């Protein structure tokens, strides 16, 4: 099993280009020529993706076919299932406790009683704990795993100057892109983000 340990890439200059795409369907409408031109001009060594899509399905997109044609490897970056399962166990336990407490609270004849108020306070507290644990998992732990995988791939590249592109689903980006960028920069990766303010015909594929 992998250990969540982030280390900077030694003796290499690493550049990350980040793009947000609306969804996986946008990858199917990719302009092959524009994508190829961008990847070749920037000397891209590999591509990482963070989309809600099965990689077998992804491999059939126009986007993936372009990468295959020009010999650029692509990787899905995410928290491993075993790590997700381990961390999510605590959340499931809290949710089961919440269900039991809620059922007990609903069954009370006098919800304004001391017992009713105590149950209500407990339910509110459990709800807060669940929300906090979900935020820690999705907004802190997951970005760390994503960056770890990016750094590991960069370390395995033979080149001294390593460039990669990270494509991420827009709604996912809204949640975690700032954390991913911050972590990459913390580990000496130069990050260049592209958004709708840039010239569309030059950078949107």
What residue ranges belong to the model's regions?
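Compositional signal for N-terminal targeting/processing segments
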Residues: 1-205
């Amino acid at each position: 099993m992998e250990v969540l340990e982030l280390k900077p890439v030694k003796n290499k200059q690493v550049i990350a280009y980040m793009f947000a795409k609306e969804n996986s369907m946008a990858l199917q409408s990719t302009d092959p020529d524009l994508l190829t031109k961008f990847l070749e001009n920037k000397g891209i060594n590999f591509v990482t993706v963070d989309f809600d899509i099965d990689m077998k399905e992804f491999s059939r997109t126009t986007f993936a076919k372009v990468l295959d044609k020009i010999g650029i490897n692509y990787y899905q970056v995410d928290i491993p299932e075993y790590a997700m399962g381990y961390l999510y166990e605590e959340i499931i336990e809290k949710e089961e406790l919440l269900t039991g407490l809620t059922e007990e609270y609903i069954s009370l004849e006098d919800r304004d009683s001391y017992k009713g108020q105590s149950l209500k306070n407990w339910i509110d507290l459990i709800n807060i704990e669940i929300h906090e644990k979900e935020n820690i998992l999705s907004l802190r732990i997951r970005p760390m795993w994503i960056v770890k995988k990016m750094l590991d791939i960069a370390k395995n590249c033979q080149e001294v100057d390593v460039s990669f592109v990270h494509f991420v689903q827009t709604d996912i980006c809204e949640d975690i892109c700032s954390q991913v960028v911050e972590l990459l920069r913390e580990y000496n990766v130069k990050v260049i983000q592209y958004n709708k303010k840039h010239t569309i015909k030059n950078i949107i594929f």
